[in-house]
């Protein structure tokens, strides 16, 4: 018996200026919810899965219908409450309150593990929201691209004289997050071999111009990589295979590998393909015996990470890109799993101390010309930032839009609100055809507690203190964000993180300008405060220089 076709599919966000909802403040979350499920963005839209294994935009199709229905009728003095992808209430609030408040995947500590989460998910009581899937601000692979670009640029600065030209990177995973890796490396002038077990993902990354070529074998991939490296020519190479098998083989070839990382879905062992399991049998095998499958996956991750550590022993720069593969490998029996660092303490924390982090926006008009106009505005606002200029220029030339046209760049405390206010002015003046939504990843300087990623190795040992993520959600709600979310388990998996997100709508009104100024000042301000409190001197300098009040420093 065949499953009947879902009449809702395919889903595309509306373009243009005609409203379905009662105002732009509610039209925006409606369009962004739909944009998350656009087939250009979503990995499995038929299952409401956007990215990251099982990261969903809504809990069920019935819940999706109720979300759409409620957003179209919601007033500007009302707030919709969303509990793990399902609308559970509408409250009368006020125009400064968020139109949507979202809580996804949150569990009490002793119950915060994958087994209990899956039991509750099977009962229809929760869903996995990842970071931007359940908070409706996913913009495709570009959403992680600049962060990945910045990370590889930091690697280049640290080890390779400011460029990756003449280097070879080996990594794995070309999904919604990992798919940014090949372009991020080539934007830094390097060569990269990307291992992926799903042929469709390789094809998609080539179609979207994130990946240059596919090699038919490891030997062919190595030959292409060495040739490009010797010519100091950027090149990204996709290789169909299982990383737990390919990386040990790379060790045997003794190819001089310079950089190693990974972005497979290791955060959830059911979405890491074990050695010996055919790709075609993956789904059936994990559903038939999740406990046994998890054990096999962890054993394969142990082999994968062992190869990474041995490449580090040979001199490669190796780092965890925030998917918990080290912890899973340790559970799989490999004791040296944590001998290489996570990317945040290794490269990104100095940026966090300045309140820098991912600042993204999408054009509700659907017109790429609106993004081109905002690109120009960003360059005019920050003419002295050479790395930003390089990024915006290359992104305009090379980044494929997925769904609504969007852009991302990293901005710091004292910068984000200037960009938001400029965009709002451009909407008001008619320079932009429709409003802009402004949000970010939950991976930010002051919005997450994640001891295996963003808060790994904090100076004061506060890696697991989650108060900061809660305060971030509260301050963004108090400051006037259009929608605010608080999630558990994004990026690194259930039991390992708590994190918050916010989105503002620049609709050209004076009220929007007031909200934007507060939110886009206070949100990155939380990053400065969090790092001052942890004892980082640079954060304390930024606080003094830019007027961030720290009561414990005022006595």
UniProtKB/Swiss-Prot annotation:
Keyword annotations of the record: Cytoplasm, Histidine metabolism, Lyase, NAD
Residues that coordinate or bind NAD(+): 52-53, 130, 176-178, 196, 201, 242-243, 263-267, 272-273, 321, 491
Location in or out of the cell: Cytoplasm
Catalytic residue list: 409
InterPro entries reported in the protein's UniProt record: Urocanase, Urocanase-like, Urocanase_C, Urocanase_central_sf, Urocanase_CS, Urocanase_N, Urocanase_Rossmann-like, Urocanase_sf
Cofactor(s) listed in the protein's UniProt record: NAD(+)
NAD as UniProt keyword: yes
GO molecular function, one term: urocanate hydratase activity
Primary site of residence: cytoplasm
Enzyme class label: lyase
Catalytic activity as recorded in UniProt: 4-imidazolone-5-propanoate = trans-urocanate + H2O
EC number: 4.2.1.49
GO biological process: L-histidine catabolic process to glutamate and formamide; L-histidine catabolic process to glutamate and formate
Pathway: Amino-acid degradation; L-histidine degradation into L-glutamate; N-formimidoyl-L-glutamate from L-histidine: step 2/3
A single cellular component GO annotation: cytoplasm
Cofactor comment text: Binds 1 NAD(+) per subunit.
Keyword Cytoplasm (UniProt): yes
Job description of the protein: Catalyzes the conversion of urocanate to 4-imidazolone-5-propionate.
Family annotation (PANTHER family): UROCANATE HYDRATASE
Membership in a protein family: Belongs to the urocanase family.
Name recorded for this polypeptide: Urocanate hydratase
Species of provenance: Nocardioides sp. (strain ATCC BAA-499 / JS614)
Gene this protein is translated from: hutU
């Amino acid at each position: 018996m065949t499953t009947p076709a879902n009449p809702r599919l395919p889903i595309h966000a509306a373009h243009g200026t005609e409203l379905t909802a009662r105002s732009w403040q509610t039209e925006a979350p409606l369009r962004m919810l739909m944009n998350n499920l656009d087939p250009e963005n979503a990995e499995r839209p038929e299952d409401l899965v956007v990215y990251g294994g099982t990261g969903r935009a809504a809990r069920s199709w019935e819940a999706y219908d109720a979300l759409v229905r409620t957003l179209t009728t919601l007033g500007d003095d009302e707030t919709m409450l969303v509990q793990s992808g399902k609308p559970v209430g509408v409250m009368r609030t006020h125009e400064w309150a968020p139109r949507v408040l979202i809580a996804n995947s949150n569990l009490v500590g002793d119950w915060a593990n994958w087994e209990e989460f899956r039991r509750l998910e099977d009962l229809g009581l929760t869903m996995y929201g990842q970071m931007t899937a359940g908070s409706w601000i996913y913009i495709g692979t570009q959403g992680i691209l600049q962060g990945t670009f910045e990370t590889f640029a930091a690697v280049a600065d640290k080890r390779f004289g400011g460029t990756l030209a003449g280097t070879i990177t080996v990594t794995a995973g070309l999904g919604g997050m990992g798919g940014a890796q090949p372009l991020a490396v080539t934007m830094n002038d390097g060569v990269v071999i990307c291992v992926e077990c799903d042929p469709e993902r390789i094809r998609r990354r080539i179609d979207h111009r994130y990946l240059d070529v596919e090699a038919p074998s490891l030997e062919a991939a190595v030959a292409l990589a060495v040739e490009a490296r010797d010519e100091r020519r950027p090149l990204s190479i996709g290789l169909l295979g299982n990383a737990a098998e390919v990386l040990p083989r790379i060790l045997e070839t003794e190819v001089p590998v310079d950089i190693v990382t990974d972005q497979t879905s290791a955060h959830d062992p059911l979405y890491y393909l074990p050695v010996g399991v055919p790709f075609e049998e993956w789904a059936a095998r994990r559903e038939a015996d999740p406990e046994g499958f998890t054990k096999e996956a962890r054993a394969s991750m142990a082999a994968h990470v062992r190869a990474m550590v041995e490449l580090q022993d040979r001199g490669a720069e190796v780092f965890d890109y925030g998917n918990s593969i080290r912890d899973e490998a340790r559970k799989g029996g490999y004791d040296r799993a944590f001998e290489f660092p996570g990317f945040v303490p290794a490269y990104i924390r100095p940026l966090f101390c300045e309140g820098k982090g991912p600042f993204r926006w999408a054009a509700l008009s659907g017109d790429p010309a609106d993004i081109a106009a905002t690109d120009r505005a960003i360059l005019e606002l920050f003419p002295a930032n050479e790395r930003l200029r390089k990024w915006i220029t290359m992104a305009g030339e090379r980044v494929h839009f997925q769904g609504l046209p969007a852009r991302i760049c990293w901005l710091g405390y004292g910068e984000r609100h200037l960009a938001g206010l400029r965009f709002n002015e451009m909407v008001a003046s008619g320079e932009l055809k429709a409003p802009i939504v402004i949000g970010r990843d939950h991976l930010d300087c002051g919005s997450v507690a994640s001891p295996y990623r963003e808060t790994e190795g904090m100076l004061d040992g506060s890696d697991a203190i989650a108060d900061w993520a809660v305060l971030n959600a509260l301050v963004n709600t108090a400051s006037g964000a259009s929608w605010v979310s608080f999630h558990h388990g994004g990026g690194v998996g259930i039991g390992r993180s708590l994190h918050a997100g916010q989105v503002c709508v620049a609709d050209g009104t004076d009220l929007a300008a007031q909200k934007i100024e507060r939110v886009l000042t206070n949100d990155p301000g939380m990053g400065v405060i969090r790092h001052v409190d942890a004892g980082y001197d640079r954060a304390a300098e930024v606080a003094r220089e830019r007027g961030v009040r720290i009561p414990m420093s005022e006595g």
